């Protein structure tokens, strides 16, 4: 009896919800396919004029080398150039120093026989075609996927065999 009352109440609530949605949809003009089509009589809006460049103050083109194609009065040679840093020789002491970071970044600072200067096109530094860690990141993912697939297959097979043995009759011969 209680189940019949619950089903009747659910039916009434569902009917009221559908009736409310239908009434709201008929009264609203929110969705109209005519809104998606352009009016053929509309003229394109004119573009706003570009603002004039300020005469002084902060300018992003100052950060670009050579002025960024700047104004008429600027010359590319007016900006002071930083002094180039001479390479610092260092020995193979076995430790890590700041010059090792400069070698890896390809900024020089390496002694003779170092592979990280980047100018020889060796494996270290920025001169290489691809980073050394890229292939290493691919292999563990593939191995993990294969191991997960094999583990799933084995567990599935074991569950199938247990189910098969569970329903076997005690006195019958193996099939």
Curated annotation (Swiss-Prot):
Tissue: Widely expressed with high levels in lung, spleen, thymus, liver and spinal cord. Expressed on leukocytes and endothelial cell contacts. Detected in a wide range of T-cells, including CD4-/CD8- and CD4+/CD8+ thymocytes. Expression is much lower in peripheral T-cells than in thymocytes.
Region (Disordered): 30-137
Transmembrane segments: 138-158
Annotated family: Belongs to the CD99 family.
InterPro entries in alphabetical order: CD99L2
Membrane-side (Cytoplasmic) residue stretches: 159-175
Localization: Membrane
Taxonomic classification: Eukaryota, Metazoa, Chordata, Craniata, Vertebrata
Gene Ontology CC terms: cell surface; plasma membrane
Major subcellular site: membrane
Membrane topology type: Single-pass type I membrane protein
Its job: Involved in T-cell adhesion processes. Plays a role in a late step of leukocyte extravasation helping leukocytes to overcome the endothelial basement membrane. Acts at the same site as, but independently of, PECAM1.
Skewed-composition ranges (Gly residues): 65-74, 106-115
Record topology, Extracellular segments: 29-137
Keyword ATP-binding set for record: no
Range of residues in the leader sequence: 1-28
UniProt record, GO biological process: homotypic cell-cell adhesion; myeloid dendritic cell activation; positive regulation of neutrophil extravasation; T cell extravasation
Protein name as annotated: CD99 antigen
Pfam families: CD99L2
UniProt keyword list: Membrane, Signal, Transmembrane, Transmembrane helix
Domain of life: Eukaryota
Assembly and binders: Homodimer. Interacts with PILRB.
């Amino acid at each position: 009896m209680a189940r019949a009352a619950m089903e009747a109440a659910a039916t009434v609530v569902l009917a009221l919800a559908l009736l409310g949605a239908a009434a709201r949809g008929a009264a609203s003009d929110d969705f109209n396919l005519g809104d998606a089509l352009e009016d053929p009589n509309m003229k394109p809006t004119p573009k706003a004029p570009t603002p004039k460049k300020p005469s002084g103050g902060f300018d992003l083109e100052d950060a670009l080398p050579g002025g960024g194609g700047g104004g008429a009065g600027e010359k590319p040679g007016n900006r002071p150039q930083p002094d180039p840093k001479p390479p610092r020789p260092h020995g193979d002491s076995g430790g890590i120093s700041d010059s090792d970071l400069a070698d890896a970044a390809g900024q020089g600072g390496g002694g003779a026989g170092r592979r990280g200067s980047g100018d020889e096109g060796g494996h270290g530094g920025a001169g290489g075609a691809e980073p050394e860690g890229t292939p290493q990141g691919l292999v563990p993912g593939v191995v993990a996927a294969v191991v997960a697939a094999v583990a799933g297959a084995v567990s599935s097979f074991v569950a199938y065999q247990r189910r098969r043995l569970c329903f076997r009759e005690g006195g019958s011969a193996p099939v």
